[in-house]
Regions:
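Cys/His-rich short segments
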Residues: 1-26
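N-terminal pre-P-loop "Q-motif" helix
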Residues: 23-46
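Walker A/P-loop
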Residues: 43-67
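Conserved catalytic network of the ASCE P-loop NTPase/AAA+ motor domain
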Residues: 68-71, 110-112, 127-130, 157-162
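Conserved RecA-like ASCE P-loop NTPase motor core of nucleic-acid helicases/translocases
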Residues: 74-82
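Residues immediately C-terminal
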Residues: 82-85, 111, 142-143, 173-174
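Inter-Walker segment of RecA-like/P-loop motor cores
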Residues: 87-88, 92-129
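Post-DEXD/H (motif II) to motif III coupling segment of the RecA-like Helicase ATP-binding lobe
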Residues: 130-191
């Protein structure tokens, strides 16, 4: 018996927003440095790795980049292999970006908006074809993403040809460290 999941493919379109966000604290010097690198990677359509310890504020370091991307009309996705991480991150994102239409997609949710700003599990990327200008991948080292070639392919096929990818993790796989140029690895050793 085959286990087949059907996905509705979201039609790709562009739409900008102001992407105002509220952050209840000021980023540290290290966090600001990482945030600026994220914006540059989005602007230049680069792949970078944010290598920071757990609790370093990786989610909040994304905010300036999200704002920049949405103001340009970019479609963005924040992706995690795990539902619990998607739920936790989506709460923080929705609390910060109060006026944004954000699709939260995982096995117990459904798409409500146009897919311009998505927080989802990696499996949900099958809904999108050459749609995202920017993809943030949290916990890139986590199972099943790290071991499943079809999920890695879903990341590629959901992205536009010219796109930015921001990998985020406290424990990067050796293969990822070897694939990303040293100057595109932002390492934050402390909280």
């Amino acid at each position: 018996m085959d286990n087949v999941t059907r996905y509705k493919i979201t039609e790709s379109s562009q739409s900008s927003s102001q992407a105002y966000y509220h952050l209840s604290f000021e980023l540290s010097e290290q966090q600001s440095y990482a945030s600026e690198h994220i914006v540059r990677a989005i602007r230049m359509r680069q792949t970078i790795l944010l290598y920071a310890v757990t609790g370093a504020g990786k989610t909040e370091m994304m905010f300036q980049g999200i704002q920049y991307a949405r103001r340009q009309g970019d479609n963005i996705a924040i992706v995690s292999p795990r539902v619990d991480v998607v739920v936790e991150i989506s709460k923080r994102i929705k609390d910060a970006f109060l006026n944004e239409d954000i699709d939260i997609l995982h096995q117990q949710s459904s798409q409500q908006f146009e897919g311009h700003f998505v927080v989802c599990t990696v499996h949900q990327l099958y809904r999108f074809k050459q749609h995202f200008d920017t993809i943030f991948i949290d916990e890139v080292d986590a199972f099943p993403l790290s071991m499943d070639k079809s999920l890695q392919q879903a990341l590629k096929s959901s992205s536009k040809v010219e796109h930015a990818t921001i990998y985020m993790t406290a424990t990067p796989p050796k293969q990822l460290l070897s694939e990303i140029p040293h100057e595109n690895i932002i390492k934050l050793p402390a909280r």
